[in-house]
């Protein structure tokens, strides 16, 4: 209560920040006449002047008003667009490590030019991050003329570029890229074998477009570079046959309830669990198949892999639906992004789930993969010195942005007042009645020439509605993962009078739906359009634009509420852009997933009783509260999941930083001999400690075993016992030093043979290769540990603390193994002098000549042709071996 009173008096924090920033907007506006008077050359010269002032100690904050005024004036001259005051506000928000919530159609692409130019003045590079290749290319080409006018270079980083093209893109002042490509390039850089193979430079400033999609919706999706593991496709096919015989049970067994089913499902977390009855049934079937013995349990340590296959197959059949979670395309399983409805080509589910779905659908099962390198988007984007983002819907997730990324969300006002009519939700008893009402609403809109965008949550639902519209005789376009190629054209036409478009979730996001259709897209289709053609197209568009405005603008129909209010707002946000008219309404039913999963049976029954007649629609404040309550539960659950993921991944992240920092140091230094010397001393001391414990009596020493170990692991044949006999006063420290000196002397002899440069290169190669191999094994071990760590909770232990503790020990063990492996490899390597190499090469060439001659003589003999001169048995063999012919090739000759 007191907070609301104070807010009314002083305004919200958002209002106070905007008031402060508005003072800077006034300064920029006051500079406009001065900058308008500048010639093009004088305006271009501002960039070098700003860089010089930065070098002299001025800050970006001090340069901001003039820099923004420069970009605004350049945009007017080059692009024909002037930044509105609200876009200047948005630019300042993005400069201050914040997230700017800017409504659809407010010009986020143009707004981004302001902070990008300012931060690029440092010369450290700026990354503009988009959700797909199309948007990265489009935005780069749109803004390229502006940046190049101001002396800035622009790069585009999308999949499929050559190494040279990638380096060029990253070297640019402003680089447009997709989030996935940036993350994968970071991982690739940390798998590089030379410094020249790396692409990325210092991660300075990232501006993330559609920041909610990347930092929240995709936060739980790790980026993984993997190599093939062992093939177990046959086992997936075998286990797949078992699942259809299992029976679902509605809830888990307890003291009060004993079910008759084999498994239960948790739809919230998409997990499946076998009941005791189910476990017995599965074990019996696996025993019959010869995959386990009757005495063994599915949960015994030796059968964990088999259990893993069973659960993967169970989840594939019961929790993942075709045309909802994935599609089958060209004989492959392609994941459908649950948030955008787009296909995610190249992505694969982990934990064997993808292989289980391939077995279920009867397509070729690809080998499982072993993780070589991985990182989450959460941890990748936290690597940037400065991070900012923009989206049309961020305020509902402001708490998460602040908690996880330290980013404050600022809502930027619209340039023109929002006049969209957001109507009350309508609830129906079942899906059939709901679809009937939706079709009637669409018919009414089409009759009035009002365009309609219908949002669905899955491909399956979009096709169901499409079928219903066909039966009703209503022409429409469908935009989902199956028709991804036509996305741009469908979105461009979605604003035409009376056009009906069905879209899954936010497919087409990032492209504005223009009332009356996109006239610029029409012109782009023409080859060398004339002024007359352009004028005709624009005139026709104006007429259509007025028709649609008179009909009420774009009408949005939501066929279900999504799990998050933010995604509902994204759908609504497609209408009412830049002060245009528009309307929206959500149609719901008690069959909707949100209702079934997150409302208890009591509330659902109460709501069913509220419907007195078939097909009745219900609108009430109670309904709005119930839906808001369900969405709040989902959002809290999802936030906890992402936070939990981050807490676990932070353990790996700290270790990743340490390994990658060490790796980069190795790549950047040609000479790592000092590091090798330190490692060698550590390893020999640890090895000696095992046989001669520190501060111990001589009776506890095992010198013969130490001699054997040094000979076997380090190729050092040292007479330790003889040394001790020769010197009665020979103590432990002296022995250690003598062993180390002998190892160093042996190593220096090898170095003198091959040369210092060769040995330095070899050391670096061994270190990198060993580090990569052990890190890969460590990632796999951490993954296995994480899968089962939740079981520690049953022993009253905190799984997170246990995970941290064990991962730290595993990491320490890995570093010890790294040192030992490197020193062992370097000690055991055999080197040869240049003379020995040349002699071996001569022998190889002589052997090759003999083999050639042998083949020739054998060919002559086998051909049946007689030689003009027969070689005598006691003459030297013509092959050059030096032997008599009868003891060489003559032994095979036919006389």
Swiss-Prot record:
Keywords: ATP-binding, Cell inner membrane, Cell membrane, Cytoplasm, Membrane, Metal-binding, Nucleotide-binding, Protein transport, Translocase, Translocation, Transport, Zinc
Residues at which ATP binds: 87, 105-109, 512
Listed Basic and acidic residues bias regions: 833-852
Cofactor needs: Zn(2+)
Keyword GTP-binding: no
GO biological process: intracellular protein transmembrane transport; protein import; protein targeting; protein transport by the Sec complex
Substrates-to-products reaction catalysed: ATP + H2O + cellular proteinSide 1 = ADP + phosphate + cellular proteinSide 2
UniProt cofactor note: May bind 1 zinc ion per subunit.
Compositional bias of kind Basic residues: 883-895
InterPro entries: Helicase_ATP-bd, P-loop_NTPase, SEC_C_motif, SecA, SecA_CS, SecA_DEAD, SecA_motor_DEAD, SecA_preprotein_X-link_dom
Top-rank EC class of the record's enzyme: translocase
MF annotations from Gene Ontology: ATP binding; metal ion binding; protein-exporting ATPase activity
Family: Belongs to the SecA family.
Protein name: Protein translocase subunit SecA
Organism, scientific name: Pasteurella multocida (strain Pm70)
């Amino acid at each position: 209560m007191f907070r609301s009173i104070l807010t009314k008096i002083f305004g919200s924090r958002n209002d106070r920040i905007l008031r402060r920033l508005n003072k800077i907007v006034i300064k920029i506006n006051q500079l406009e006449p001065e900058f308008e008077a500048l010639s093009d050359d004088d305006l271009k010269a501002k960039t070098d002047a700003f860089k010089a002032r930065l070098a002299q100690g001025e800050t970006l904050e001090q340069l901001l008003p003039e820099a923004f005024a420069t970009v605004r004036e350049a945009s007017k001259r080059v692009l024909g667009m002037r930044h509105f005051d609200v876009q200047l506000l948005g630019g300042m928000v993005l400069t201050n490590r914040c997230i700017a919530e800017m409504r659809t159609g407010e010009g986020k692409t143009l707004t981004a030019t302001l902070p990008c130019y300012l931060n690029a003045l440092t010369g450290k590079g700026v990354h503009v991050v988009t959700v797909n290749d199309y948007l990265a290319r489009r935005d780069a080409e749109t803004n390229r003329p502006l940046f190049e006018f101001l002396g800035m270079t622009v790069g585009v980083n999308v999949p499929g570029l050559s190494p040279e093209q990638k380096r060029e893109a990253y070297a640019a002042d402003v680089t447009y890229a997709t989030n996935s490509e940036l993350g994968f390039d970071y991982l690739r850089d940390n798998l590089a074998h030379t410094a020249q193979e790396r692409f990325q430079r210092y991660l300075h400033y990232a501006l993330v477009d559609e920041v909610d999609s990347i930092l929240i919706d995709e936060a739980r999706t790790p980026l993984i570079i993997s190599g093939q593991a062992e093939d177990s496709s046959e086992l997936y096919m075998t286990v797949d046959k078992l699942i259809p015989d299992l029976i679902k049970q509605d809830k888990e067994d307890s003291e009060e309830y004993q079910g008759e089913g084999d498994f239960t499902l948790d739809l919230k977390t998409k997990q499946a669990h076998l009941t005791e009855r189910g476990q017995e049934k599965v074990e019996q079937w696996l025993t019959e198949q010869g995959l386990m013995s009757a005495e063994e349990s599915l949960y015994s340590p030796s059968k964990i892999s088999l259990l893993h296959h069973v659960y993967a197959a169970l989840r594939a059949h019961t929790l993942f639906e075709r045309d909802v979670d994935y599609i089958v395309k060209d004989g492959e399983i392609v994941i459908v992004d649950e948030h955008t409805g787009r296909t995610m080509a190249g992505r694969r589910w982990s934990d064997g789930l993808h292989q289980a779905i391939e077995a279920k659908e009867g397509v070729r099962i690809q080998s499982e993969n072993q993780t070589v390198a991985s990182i989450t988007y959460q941890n990748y984007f936290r690597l940037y010195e400065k991070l900012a983002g923009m989206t049309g819907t961020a305020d509902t997730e402001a708490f998460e942005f602040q908690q996880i990324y330290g980013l404050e969300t600022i809502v930027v006002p619209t340039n023109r007042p929002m006049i969209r009519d957001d109507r009350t939700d309508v609830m129906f008893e079942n899906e059939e009645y709901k679809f009937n009402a939706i079709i009637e609403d669409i018919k009414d809109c089409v009759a009035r020439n009002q365009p309609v965008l219908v949002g669905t949550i899955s491909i399956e639902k979009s096709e169901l509605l499409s079928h219903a519209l066909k039966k009703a005789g209503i022409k429409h376009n469908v935009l989902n993962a199956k028709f991804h190629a036509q996305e741009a054209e469908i979105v461009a036409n979605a604003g035409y009078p009376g056009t009906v478009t069905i879209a899954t979730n936010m497919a087409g996001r990032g492209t504005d739906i223009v009332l009356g259709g996109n006239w610029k897209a029409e012109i782009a289709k023409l080859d060398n359009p004339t002024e007359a053609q352009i004028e005709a197209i624009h005139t026709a568009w104006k007429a259509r634009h007025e028709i649609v405005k008179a009909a009420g603008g774009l009408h949005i129909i939501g066929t279900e509420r999504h799990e998050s209010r933010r995604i509902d707002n994204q759908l609504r946000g497609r209408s009412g852009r830049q002060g245009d008219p528009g309307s929206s309404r959500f149609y719901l039913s008690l069959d909707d997933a949100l209702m079934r999963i997150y409302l208890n049976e009591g509330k659902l029954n109460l709501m069913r009783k509220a419907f007195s007649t078939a097909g009745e629609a219900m609108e009430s404040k109670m309904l709005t509260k119930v839906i808001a309550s369900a969405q709040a539960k989902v959002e809290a659950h999802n936030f906890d999941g992402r936070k939990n993921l981050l807490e676990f991944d932070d353990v790996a992240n700290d270790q990743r930083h340490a390994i990658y920092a060490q790796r980069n140091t190795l790549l950047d230094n040609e000479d790592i001999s000092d590091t090798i010397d330190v490692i060698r001393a550590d390893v020999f001391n640890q090895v000696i400690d095992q046989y001669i414990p520190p501060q111990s009596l001589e009776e506890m020493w095992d010198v013969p075993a130490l001699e054997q170990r040094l000979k076997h692991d380090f190729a050092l044949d040292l007479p330790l016992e003889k040394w001790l006999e020769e010197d009665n006063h020979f103590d432990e420290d002296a022995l250690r030093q003598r062993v180390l000196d002998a190892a160093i002397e042996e190593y220096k002899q090898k170095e003198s043979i091959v040369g210092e440069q060769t040995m330095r290169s070899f050391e670096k190669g061994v270190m990198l290769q060993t580090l990569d191999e052990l890190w890969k094994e460590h990632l796999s071990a951490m993954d296995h540990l994480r899968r089962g760590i939740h079981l520690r909770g049953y022993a009253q232990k905190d799984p997170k603390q246990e995970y941290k503790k064990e991962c730290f020990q595993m990491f320490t063990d890995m570093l010890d193994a790294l040192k030992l492996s490197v020193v062992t490899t370097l000690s055991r390597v055999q080197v040869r002098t240049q003379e020995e190499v040349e002699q071996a090469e001569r022998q190889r060439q002589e052997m090759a000549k003999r083999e050639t001659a042998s083949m020739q003589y054998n060919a002559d003999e086998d051909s049946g042709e007689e030689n003009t001169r027969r070689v005598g048995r006691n003459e030297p063999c013509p092959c050059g071996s030096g032997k008599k012919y009868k003891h060489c090739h003559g032994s095979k000759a036919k006389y």
